[in-house]
Structures are given as structure tokens and as C-alpha cells.
């Protein structure tokens, strides 16, 4: 074999290798492009305590790995802290609302619980268990609980305080429902990616309190869908940050802002009217018309109330071509969220994947 033919052979091998590398790069670029299409970004928005974090927990239960016993154990301290936080809020409100304790001994119990530094709570033992039990059974505290719209109290208060014996058991392990009910204000941004039908859904939860909202802005690129949560039960409540502003008015103002943002022009909007279970309870004694005088429907009618609230939000949409998809939800009810999210997923996939022939 001559030198020339050996060189030609080597060259063609090199050329082949170069072409192979080039083809591989092209293939990878095509793959990346396709994968980018297959990742859908869902932005969870809504005011503080509307249920966004609970919704993410449900995605982990329904479409992810769920919560192992070890994971659940990690919530034990938070459950204890939620109980102390709730009782302290009611003890403070007893003073503010000038409600007396029915039983004299509960004043000492209140003092004991009031002095606890909640951040440092890591156990739930006596004398605190008995003190909190005794306080919860005091008619004064029960009256204070009934007036909770006048101050800030977690929605999970009754759930935990009605189950103190179980939580106080030394072998207590939080249940899935306990995990769903734990309240930890979201600071910063939480992302939860999960895989469905070879499509990655990346759900992004941002803090709802006003101080957290300035951090949202960089989440707004390439958003497939806005999922906006409203707590139906907030029609008679005031804001954490400002006690003379109605929470639902704040939620409406935020929704109006979000749906008119120019960078959401191509994002679908899904409205979750959440906490429908709490609305059903509350509507029996707290009348919608007292807070929204334009309501002219029947009193004590949860169905009429929620339809009115839905219409209030849908009417904020200035673009008649843009459909707002809506669902009534209870974020702590796994079966309800499983059912609702199946419908939402179909909506999102149909709207966004038709053009890529992936459905």
C-alpha cells in the first residue's frame, strides 16, 4: 500500500468520524428541542394561604413518590409547632376581643402556653398537652375560635386540636392528612417536577404573602399555564399584612394583574376555587352579602355563593377570546385533586401539545 493511499484512507476515516460527531450533535440538538417542548411549566399563583403548597404536596402523593414514614416523621415537629401557634393566636385574640375564660384555671394554662417559644418546640408533652386540651374545651376559647375571621388563625386549627390525644401519643407518626394540613408559609420558590405520559410537568410554587411577590418575576418565562388559587372561605377575612383589607378583594386584584400581564398572553389560565369544604361550613353563619353587597342570591347556599365568587373572578378577564378554565377544589382531599388534576392535565396537553403532534 502506497503512502498516498494510507493517507487517503486515514483522511476518510477522520472525515467519517467528523461527520459522525456532527450527526450526533445534530441529533442531540433535535432531542433537546423536543425535550424542551415536552417540559411544561405550571406556575401556581394566589395570595397567602390559598392552598398552593398543599396542591404541590398532592402532586407528590398522586404523581410522585409520596411520603414515606421517614418523610412523615420529618413533619412531627411542625405539627407540634402548628398546635402551639394556633393556641397562642387564640390566647392573644381572647385579650383583643375581650372574651373571658369560663374556667378560672385556664388563665394559668393560657399563661403557660403563651410563654412558649414556638420556634424551639420539638416535643409535645405535659404540662402543655393538658393545658392546651383544657383551653380548647373552654367555652371562652370556643367563642374565640368562632370569631376567627377577626384575627389570623390557621385553617387546620380545629383539625389538630380535636385530635390532641393522637398527636400527643409518644409513638405519634404524622398521617398523610396531617402532612397535607401542616402550615409552613412558603418563602422563596419551590419547584416540583413530575413525569406524566412522557411529558415533564414542572410546577412552581411562589410565596403568596406580599413580601414574597417581588421574587416571582423571573419565574415568568415560558409559562405554559397559570394555575391561580383562590380560597373560597376568605370572603369574610382580612389580610395577614393589613387588618382592614378583605382577603378576597386582594385575591381579585392579584388575579386582575396576573391575567393582564403581557408575558402571559400565550399561557392558559386555570382558576382553582379552593377550600370549598370551608365555604360550605362558613356560609351557614357568615353571610356573603355582608362583605359583597352586590350578592343578591340566597343566604346559607354554598352553591350560589361559589358561583357568585367564580363570576366575580371570571369577569375580571378583559380578553373575551381567552378562556378561563375553572374548578372547585378541596386541596386537602387527595381524591378530589386527583380527579381535578386529571382534567387539568388533559386541558393543558391538548392546548399545548397539539402543535408538536405529541398527543
From Swiss-Prot:
The keyword Hydrolase applies. It catalyses: GTP + H2O = GDP + phosphate + H(+). GO terms for biological process: action potential; adenylate cyclase-activating G protein-coupled receptor signaling pathway; cranial skeletal system development; developmental pigmentation; embryonic digit morphogenesis; endothelin receptor signaling pathway; forebrain neuron development; G protein-coupled receptor signaling pathway. SUPFAM superfamilies: P-loop containing nucleoside triphosphate hydrolases (SSF52540), Transducin (alpha subunit), insertion domain (SSF47895). Mg(2+) binds at residues 53, 186. Coiled coil: none annotated. Residues 178-186 are annotated as: G2 motif. Keywords: Cell membrane, Golgi apparatus, GTP-binding, Hydrolase, Lipoprotein, Magnesium, Membrane, Metal-binding, Nucleotide-binding, Nucleus, Palmitate, Transducer. It is a lipid-anchor. GO terms for cellular component: cell body; dendrite; Golgi apparatus; heterotrimeric G-protein complex; membrane; nuclear membrane; plasma membrane; postsynaptic cytosol. Disruption phenotype: Mice are viable but suffer from cerebellar ataxia and display deficiencies in primary hemostasis due to a defect in platelet activation. Mice lacking Gnaq and Gna11 are embryonic lethal due to cardiomyocyte hypoplasia. Mice lacking Gnaq and with one single intact copy of Gna11, as well as mice lacking Gna11 and with one single intact copy of Gnaq die shortly after birth; lethality is caused by heart malformations. Newborns display craniofacial defects. Residues 329-334 are annotated as: G5 motif. Residues 270-277 are annotated as: G4 motif. It is found in: Cell membrane; Golgi apparatus; Nucleus; Nucleus membrane. A lipid is attached at residues 9-10 (S-palmitoyl cysteine). Residues 38-359 form the G-alpha domain. G proteins are composed of 3 units; alpha, beta and gamma. The alpha chain contains the guanine nucleotide binding site. Interacts (GDP-bound form) with RIC8A (via C-terminus); promoting GNAQ folding and association with the plasma membrane. Binds NHERF1. Forms a complex with PECAM1 and BDKRB2. Interacts with GAS2L2. Belongs to the G-alpha family. G(q) subfamily. This is Guanine nucleotide-binding protein G(q) subunit alpha. It comes from Mus musculus (Mouse).
